[in-house]
Regions:
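Positively charged n-region of N-terminal signal peptides that target proteins for export
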Residues: 1-7
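Bacterial N-terminal signal peptides
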Residues: 10-18
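Sequence context of c-type cytochrome heme-c attachment sites
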Residues: 19-145, 149-220, 349
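Internal amphipathic alpha-helical segments of the cytochrome P450 catalytic fold
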Residues: 31, 236-237
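Gly/Gly-Pro-rich "capping" loops immediately C-terminal to redox-active cysteine motifs
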Residues: 76-89, 222-223, 237-254
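Active-site proximal loops enriched in glycine and acidic residues that flank catalytic Cys/His/Asp
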Residues: 210, 231-234
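Cysteine-rich micro-motifs
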Residues: 227-228
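Mature extracytoplasmic or organellar-lumen-exposed domains after removal of signal/transit peptides
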Residues: 232, 238-240, 245-375
Length: 375
């Protein structure tokens, strides 16, 4: 009898402990949710937003990769200047000024509560964004306006029908706003209204799906059943992503085909080592041994990963792929080559990371237009 009572008490205590643990997991506070989010990434802050890592270049990256940088930049952004952090007189920020903003390894913080929330926890930006680093503003997007201040291509407004962008610039990672609002794609007229209903006909745009409809709002992770909440149980994200993924793969194959057609011209690159984050100039390449490519960005520039027959991979920014070493070498892919604009579009969808969910119509039309533009 005594043993039975002890077993009963033990099981009861175990049950209470499990219940308490379950309740704690189910009712995490905003701070605990944030700790599990990608905004809580001080390692990224140290690499991109400190003077030790970037010198004066931290004025560019710290805008969106640190709490101190964002708060220093926001008044400037609201005043109409979306460029890198500047001094009060408008001149470029230097290392002493950035150090005074605490953009150092010792003090720089990731995107914390006070980056997004001001007094009384009011959001610092709502409803309509100022002119964004991507070169446009988003109007009447509710609380999602705050997200959009950073989650955009951050490299100025492109001209959709230009025949020569005169640069190899890539979209910045987390380029969701451009896709949601239907902007900054080559080969597709983006001067009209191509915004997604998810951005302009859903209250608070980003916040609705990534916070309001989730069990852990400050994790910023959209719930797996979000699509079904509005569109019915048969509609999942995969339901939308499958055809877009196919088009995205076709675009990569079309770009790869153009590279392989001229691979024998490729003899020299400035190779990037992703493990060390260093560049080596005038690296000889036997173009005949290139079997394929991947497409990414390094240092804000479109980058091809050349896949070699021996299994090696060589990273090179597109403007550093040449037909001869040194200054006499000519770039194999000039900025006017359609492959440059096609690669921008490919990366735009890659870095949006929704594979069509954010704006299926714009994404499909843009990918099809890009495929048609590649002879």
């Amino acid at each position: 009898m005594k043993r039975s009572v002890l077993i009963y008490i033990g099981l009861s205590l175990l049950g209470l402990a499990l219940l308490a643990g379950g309740l704690q997991a189910a009712f995490l506070g905003p701070a605990e949710e944030w700790e599990k989010s990608k905004h809580n990434n001080r390692a990224t802050t140290l690499v991109h937003a400190t003077v030790e890592a970037r010198s004066a270049g931290a004025a560019h990256c710290a805008r969106c990769h640190s709490e101190q940088g964002f708060r220093a930049w926001l008044p400037q952004l609201l005043a109409g200047n979306p460029g890198p952090i500047a001094k009060p007189d408008g001149s470029a920020a230097d290392v002493p000024f950035l150090t005074g903003l605490e953009l150092t390894r010792e003090k720089a913080q990731p995107i914390t509560c006070t980056a997004c929330h001001g007094e009384g926890f009011a959001l610092r930006v709502q409803n309509t964004t100022p002119l964004l680093p991507a070169g446009f503003a988003a109007t009447a997007v509710g609380k999602g306006a705050l997200c959009m201040t950073c989650h955009n291509t951050r490299n100025g407004r492109i001209t959709w029908n230009t025949e020569d962008p005169k640069r190899y610039t890539a979209p910045h990672a987390s380029a969701q706003t451009d896709v949601i609002m239907g902007k900054n794609a080559f080969f597709l007229d983006d001067t009209g209204e191509r915004a997604s209903a998810h951005g302009v006909f859903v209250r608070d745009s980003c916040v609705s799906c990534h916070m309001t409809l989730t069990k852990a709002p400050h994790s910023f992770r959209a719930a797996e059943n979000n699509c079904a909440n509005c569109h019915g149980p048969v509609v999942t994200k995969e339901f939308v992503q499958q055809p877009i993924t196919e088009l995205h793969k076709r675009l990569k194959a079309a770009i790869e085909k153009r590279v392989l057609a001229v691979k024998e011209k490729i003899t020299t690159v400035r190779a990037y080592d992703p493990a060390k984050a260093t560049y080596t100039p005038n690296v000889a390449v036997d173009g005949k041994q290139i079997t394929g490519i991947d497409i990414t960005s390094v240092g804000g520039q479109i980058t091809f990963i050349l896949k070699m027959a021996d299994g090696k991979e060589i990273y090179s920014q597109l403007g550093d792929i040449k037909d001869a070493p040194g200054d006499p070498g000519k770039v194999v892919f000039a900025t006017a080559d359609p492959i440059v604009r096609a690669a921008w579009n490919y990366i735009l969808i890659k870095y949006d990371r929704s594979m069509g969910v954010h704006n299926p119509t714009f994404t499909r039309e843009m990918l099809l237009a890009t495929l048609r533009a590649l002879p």
